[in-house]
UniProtKB/Swiss-Prot annotation:
Highest taxon, organism lineage: Archaea
GO cellular component terms, semicolon-separated: cytoplasm
Active-site residues, record numbering mapped to chain: D62 (proton acceptor)
GO biological process: NAD metabolic process; NADP biosynthetic process
Keywords: ATP-binding, Cytoplasm, Kinase, NAD, NADP, Nucleotide-binding, Transferase
Reactions performed catalytically: NAD(+) + ATP = ADP + NADP(+) + H(+)
Residues noted as binding NAD(+) in the record, renumbered to the chain: 62-63, 67, 129-130, 140, 157, 159, 170-175, 194, 229
Cofactor: a divalent metal cation
Listed GO MF terms: ATP binding; metal ion binding; NAD+ kinase activity
Cellular location(s): Cytoplasm
Role played: Involved in the regulation of the intracellular balance of NAD and NADP, and is a key enzyme in the biosynthesis of NADP. Catalyzes specifically the phosphorylation on 2'-hydroxyl of the adenosine moiety of NAD to yield NADP.
Full protein name: NAD kinase
Length: 272
């Protein structure tokens, strides 16, 4: 078994959690550290783009998990070090018991949809949560034309447009008023950031669809942001194309059902 450890930047506490896991796992398991983890744990660290493992343990939060999914290869086990951590599987007080489950093989690998994204036909990195087209300056509304499978859907004036996966529907899209999609739903959510008209509502389209966002008007420079990790400048006349990727995001899970995650990570926080 090859296990990789990736931790949040400058997080000594994350390294302490990693060390506690290392002390429990079998000595014959091969251990790999990213450059950040190696600072605290010793040894030679690998750049995250060079990491490939049977299990990648992400210690930090959703940002750490998304960074792994965009750059490394292997199913991810996320440990939440604070915040909601919807993409993480376990909390700090569950590390010991979950490590023993990992050793015994009492887990499953869940796959989730990823998006492939193009600017004017040039393919970029895939993303797991969402692709966001956003104004490049604060308080400067933009005009976007949206097409689904080549059919014109709408022209919208807003601060931005979000196209989210079922996994990402609980994140940025949700804060923009988009619906929650269960991971088993084959769809994408198109939602809008501060639309000029309140009559414009989010739309769910089939996962097999291709969504195109065209930057309309003059002097409409904007940004394309993938999972909050990668950022690209786009200008008037550019077209962003988004569709389902051939690749999948893979997560290590100890939960019995997707409803456990929904309850623990979303509903419980809303109710409380």
């Amino acid at each position: 078994m090859k296990v990789a450890f990736v931790i949040r930047k400058d997080c000594k506490r994350c390294a302490t959690i990693a060390k506690s896991i290392i002390e429990l796992i079998p000595p014959d398991w091969e251990k790999i550290y990213d450059t950040e983890a190696a600072k605290f744990l010793g040894g030679v660290g690998k750049d995250i783009t060079e990491i490939s493992a049977d299990i990648i343990i992400a210690i930090g939060g959703d940002g750490t998990v998304l960074r792994i999914l965009q750059n490394a290869k292997g199913p991810v086990l996320g440990i939440n070090m604070g915040g909601l951590g919807f993409l993480t599987e376990i909390e700090i007080d569950e590390v010991g018991s979950s490590t023993y489950k990992l050793i015994r093989g009492e887990y499953k690998i869940n796959e989730a949809m990823k998006l492939k994204v193009y600017i004017n036909g040039r393919r970029l990195e895939d993303c797991t949560n969402e692709a966001v087209v956003h104004t490049d300056r604060i308080a400067r509304i933009r005009q976007f034309k949206i097409y689904v499978d080549g059919h014109f859907l709408t022209t919208i004036k807003s601060d931005g447009v979000i196209v989210a996966t079922p996994t990402g529907s609980s994140s940025y899209s949700s804060s923009a008023g988009g619906p929650l999609l269960l991971p088993t739903v084959r769809g994408m959510v198109i939602s809008y950031l501060a639309p000029y008209s309140s009559r414009i509502k989010p739309v769910v389209v089939p996962s097999e669809s291709t969504v195109e966002i065209k930057i309309a008007g003059n002097d409409q420079d904007s940004l394309l942001i993938l999972d909050g990790q990668k950022e690209y400048k786009i200008k008037s006349g550019d077209t962003v194309s988004i569709s389902m990727s051939e690749e999948k995001a893979r997560f290590v899970s100890f939960r019995e059902s997707i409803y456990d995650r929904l309850r623990d990570k979303v509903i419980k926080h809303v109710v409380n």
